[in-house]
A protein has these predicted regions:
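Single conserved hydrophobic/aromatic residue that forms the stacking wall/gate
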Residues: 1-11
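Flexible loop/hinge segments that line or gate small-molecule binding clefts
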Residues: 25-64, 161-172
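Hydrophobic alpha-helical segments within soluble ligand-binding/sensing domains
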Residues: 48-84, 137, 177-196
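Flexible loop/turn connectors
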Residues: 123-128, 135-211
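Periplasmic-binding protein-like
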Residues: 16-25, 82-88, 125-134, 156-158
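Short, conserved loop/helix-junction motifs that constitute active-site signature segments
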Residues: 34-39, 77, 148-152
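Short acidic low-complexity segments
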Residues: 115-123
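An alpha-beta-alpha
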Residues: 67-106, 199-211
Length: 211
């Protein structure tokens, strides 16, 4: 059963379910309601940069793993004049990624920028963009087709979290992503066996023609 943000805390304090699979909506803190759940019954997914106590979890690392994924692409990124992270003000993505983005760019001497007002982004020749949300990917591709700029040649594009569409858009969009199938397998294993699991999935690079 899917439980939305308006769910009652009674759900947590009861024995309605044998297992709870929860994707926390804050990377920095755990909802206090969840502390009412027996740790043997709860699995936390995705966000998790907080004290998870005795709870099982399968989380993303939005910091070091993000840095190392960018480092794996450094030679491709050097083809461009500037690396731009699109980070809308209202995004749920952890802000700590911005710090590690800045660290990467400083360590490898790459000119960079973080853009929060993504509605006004102008695609420019010589820049490579990291788009966390799919809407920014779509807007950049649409704008480039209007201006005649070619993705992977005139400018670069990196998306976050892989989808089947990214494999075919403009001959393939390079992606930074965890293995979502592996996350699903580990969640199913927890439900079926009840065995404790505490792991961060690595951010993988799917290199395609967009950079």
């Amino acid at each position: 059963e899917m439980i939305g943000s308006d769910w009652s805390s009674d759900v947590c304090s009861s024995d309605l379910y044998n297992k709870y699979i929860v994707m926390n909506f804050d990377n920095e803190k755990l909802s206090p309601h969840l502390y009412k759940i027996d740790s043997s019954k709860l699995l936390l997914l995705d966000f998790g940069k907080f004290d998870k106590k005795d709870y099982s979890y399968v989380c993303q690392d939005f910091d070091d793993s993000f840095y190392h994924a960018l480092a794996a692409l450094k030679e491709h990124l050097r083809k461009y004049q500037r690396l731009v992270l699109l980070f809308p003000e209202d995004i749920k993505h952890p802000r700590s990624s911005c710090q590690y983005f800045n660290c990467f760019c400083q360590d490898y001497h790459i000119d960079s920028a973080i853009v929060e007002n993504t509605d006004r982004i102008q695609v420019r020749k010589g820049e490579v963009y990291i788009a966390i949300r799919q809407i920014e990917v779509v807007n950049i591709i649409k704008q480039s087709r209007t201006t005649g700029l070619k993705c992977g040649e005139d400018f670069g594009l990196i998306a976050y979290n892989d989808t089947p569409a990214y494999e075919v858009i403009d001959q393939g969009i390079t992606v930074l992503s965890i293995n979502w199938e592996e996350l699903g397998r580990k969640a199913a294993e927890f439900v079926l066996t009840g065995q404790e699991i505490r792991t961060y999935l690595p951010t993988e690079v799917h290199l395609r023609n967009s950079i």
